[in-house]
Amino acid sequence: MKTLPGVVLSWFGPPASAYALSFATSRLGSASLSRLVIVSNRVPVPDAAGKGTAGGLAVALREAFQTYQGIWFGWTGRVAAQPSPEPRIVDKGGMQYALMDLTSLDRQEYYNGFANRALWPTMHYRVGLSDFSRADYAGYLRVNRTFARALAKLVLPSDLVWVHDYHLIPLAAELRPLGLTNLIGYFHHIPWPAPEVLGTLPGSTDILRSIMDFNLVGVQTERDADNLRRALIQELNAAPQKEDVLDADGKSICVKSFPIGIDVIDFQKVAARPRPNRILGQTIAGLGSRKLIIGVDRLDYSKGIRQRMEAYEHFLASNLDQRGQVTYLQIAPTSRSEVPEYETLSRDVNETLGRINGSLGEPGWVPIQYVTSSYPRSLLAALYRLARVALVTPMRDGMNLVAKEYVAAQDPLDPGVLILSKFAGAAQQLTGALIVNPNDKLEVAEAIRDALRMSHKERVIRWQSMIGPLRDRDVSWWATAFLKELAAQQRTTATYPN
């Protein structure tokens, strides 16, 4: 197996850094160091206080990047009338960022359009919500081409390039004709659907062809990997070679699952020592002797928030003795407000919320507390630890790190209960959760009842069965495993027209 070329992996803090540093030392010796080039749709540049975006991808990758000599390339999130074709280089916190602005048309076609109105719903099995536009698809390809031209000038021959998520699937196909033979990896954070579902999207065959220009494609679960392999075989006549490797059109690609993790030890520390916080204090005071049920999701139709509220309503209707004894806190920061489907979702959720609270609420008790603002990581950790039950019931989800954070945040002596959708990637690892079908409101309602009634002994046993695997496959394991596999691949030898 090839050694990892120049990759220093001591980025995650103890004890993960001890393993990572040992790995780097044993594999590299005195070899000259190359860089890691991370590419993502949005770049979480730290603010003046040193804080960056709190999204799951940003947190996971920042952990990897902090002690690494490399570049993080992507969109600033801003639009400009005439953005520069060259990236703006920013050095902050010992890290280097290469930042691109987009035009308003770019944002509409690339981001709001094809990425989030066509790819996103299709990847989440919501083909009825997919809205394909040739103009949007052209804009999606155009922005990837613009990014590739800017990025190619920054990449050194020995660099490892790590591309993230569905916005940037064509990026390697745009980089190769510019002369890049580097090892380029891609990690797909959301579900990869069955070939029959992906095939409903116009342009899906071209998407698969562009995938072949990566050396390694990582997905969250083995089910996702199998779906992608089957699609490549069916649509491109790809020929399986050795394990996980397929050849098509003179190119070779490795497809493997790498379930993303969290920094378990750090999250446990944050949850165990909560900072004084007004919201936390008010929540504790407002609960009194009631048990807390919590849900934390970005407001998205894939998360099943409305269906979850209706299941909770069914639970209250079927368990009259629980009225006034529990409170369900749903934190759902709004997102993608410029996409019509999200405006519709917001109205639907608010109507459901109003109906439930209006029909079941009592003086001094509101069944559902609903918050649309983002909470900092430290506050979320404290709320997870406070909650007896977590409802993580997406209709589809690549992984769902909230489920893992909830488990990590628990008091080992008095843990809560995780209710988890069978369609979340995390369900493959967190088998100690109460696994449910989010489409079955009765099943979810019964799981809520069972979770609240569960004995202390069973809660501890279930939690212990989950925390070990989380520690074993944390975010350090994820990044190390992916980059090690990428470095083991053969460099690209295919020829491309200029």
Each language-model region and where it sits:
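Catalytic cores of carbohydrate-active enzymes across secretory and cytosolic contexts
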Residues: W11-F12, A18-N498
